[in-house]
C-alpha cells in the first residue's frame, strides 16, 4: 500500500522474470500462500500457452492448497502429471525427473552462446524450453531423503534453467540435521515488495 497525504492505494508487487532463486514461504502464513496463488496466476497469464508446466505437490491438504487451480489438472500440457502429487513415491519421481531435465539442460543445451533458460530461448525461438513452476506445500511432509537431495539441486540450479521452486516450509520440522544442506540452498522470502 502506498500513501501520500489524503491519497492511498495498493500497488502490485514487482516481480522480475525469470526468477533468480527459489521462492520460499513460511507454511502457515495465509497471506504468503495467497502470494503463491497470485504468482501462479501471473505466470499463467504472462506466458504463452504451452510455455509453462506446473508440478503441484500438496501432501497434507490433498490438493486443497492449490484449490483455485484444480480445474487446470485436465490440461495435460499444463500439468503433465494430471493431478496434485500427494504421496512420497510420486513426489520423488517428479522431483527426480525435473532434476534430470535440469542436468540435461546444463550439460547438453547450454553452451558458450546460452548459459541459461532466457538466453537459450532467445537464440532458439522456434523450439523454446517451457518454464516450469514446482509448487510444494507442507515441506518436509512426504519428502524422502532422495527427494530432499533432488529439491536441493532444483533450488540451486533450477532458476537459471527455467524451473522455479515455490516452497512452503514448516520451519519447525526442518530443524533436523538431515535438512541442513537443503536449507542452506534456500533464501527465505522477505516482504520487501520485490521478490
What are these regions (language model features)?
Residues 2-115, 124-195:
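P-loop NTPase catalytic phosphate-binding loop
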Amino acid at each position: 500500500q502506498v500513501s501520500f497525504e489524503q491519497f492511498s492505494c495498493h500497488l502490485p508487487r514487482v516481480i522480475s522474470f525469470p526468477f533468480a532463486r527459489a521462492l520460499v514461504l513460511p507454511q502457515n502464513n495465509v497471506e504468503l500462500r495467497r502470494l503463491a496463488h497470485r504468482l501462479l496466476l501471473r505466470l499463467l497469464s504472462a506466458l504463452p500457452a504451452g510455455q509453462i508446466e506446473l508440478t503441484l505437490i500438496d501432501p497434507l491438504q490433498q490438493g486443497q492448497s492449490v484449490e483455485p487451480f484444480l480445474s487446470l489438472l485436465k490440461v495435460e500440457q499444463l500439468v503433465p502429471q494430471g493431478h496434485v502429487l500427494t504421496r512420497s513415491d510420486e513426489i520423488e519421481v517428479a522431483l527426480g525427473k525435473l532434476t534430470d531435465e535440469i542436468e540435461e539442460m546444463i550439460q547438453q543445451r547450454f553452451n558458450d552462446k546460452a548459459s541459461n533458460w532466457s538466453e537459450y530461448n532467445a537464440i532458439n525461438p522456434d523450439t523454446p524450453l517451457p518454464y516450469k513452476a514446482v509448487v510444494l506445500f507442507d515441506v518436509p511432509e512426504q519428502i524422502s531423503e532422495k527427494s530432499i537431495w533432488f529439491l536441493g539441486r532444483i533450488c540451486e540450479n533450477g532458476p537459471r534453467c527455467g524451473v522455479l521452486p515455490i516452497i512452503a516450509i514448516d520451519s519447525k520440522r526442518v530443524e533436523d540435521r538431515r535438512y541442513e544442506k537443503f536449507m542452506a540452498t534456500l533464501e527465505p522470502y522477505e516482504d520487501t515488495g520485490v521478490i
